[in-house]
């Protein structure tokens, strides 16, 4: 009789382990999957940020183009115009990559925070008159949704107004 009781006890314990352990294992699995996704998203964001830093170095290496000025640089030589178009193409390519990898119609607060920094970069560059003027050429062959996004951004009032620091410098 003691033997059958221990068998019943073991059977009951196995049901309890199954009833508790399986849902717990699923929860742990889902948590690990989310954490892995978050880490991958953070890695993508970091790589894009590093690429933007590299772009800024290229812009700094070309001071004659005055790429950090809000106004269009006047009287550029043919070679300078060509360099500027190449640099702006690099920037559009980076913006498109950021859009394709980071933008989602519905984002978590963390995703929205990451995306907002890129939206700010895009808005900042769209404030440049010469950048906006070159957009039709720069956007040829780019992703249609990205093209629509950047055109909307470039056409917005905030893109046409100088940034606060630019307005203060005047």
Which ranges hold each PLM region?
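Alpha-helical transmembrane segments of integral membrane proteins
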Residues: 18-28
């Amino acid at each position: 009789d003691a033997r059958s009781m221990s068998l019943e006890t073991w059977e009951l314990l196995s049901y309890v382990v199954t009833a508790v352990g399986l849902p717990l294992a699923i929860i742990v699995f889902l948590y690990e999957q989310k954490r892995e996704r978050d880490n991958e998203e953070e890695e993508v964001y970091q790589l894009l940020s590093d690429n933007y830093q590299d772009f800024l170095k290229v812009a700094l290496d070309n001071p004659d183009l005055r790429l950090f000025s809000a106004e269009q640089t006047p009287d550029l030589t043919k070679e300078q115009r060509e360099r500027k178009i190449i640099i702006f193409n690099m920037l559009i390519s980076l913006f498109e990559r950021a859009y394709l990898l980071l933008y989602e119609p519905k984002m978590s607060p963390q995703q929205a925070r990451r995306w907002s920094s890129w939206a700010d970069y895009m808005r900042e560059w769209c404030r440049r008159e010469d950048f906006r003027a070159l957009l039709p050429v720069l956007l040829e062959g780019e992703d249609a949704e990205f093209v629509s996004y950047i055109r909307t951004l470039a056409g917005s009032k905030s893109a046409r107004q100088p940034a606060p620091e630019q307005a203060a410098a005047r």
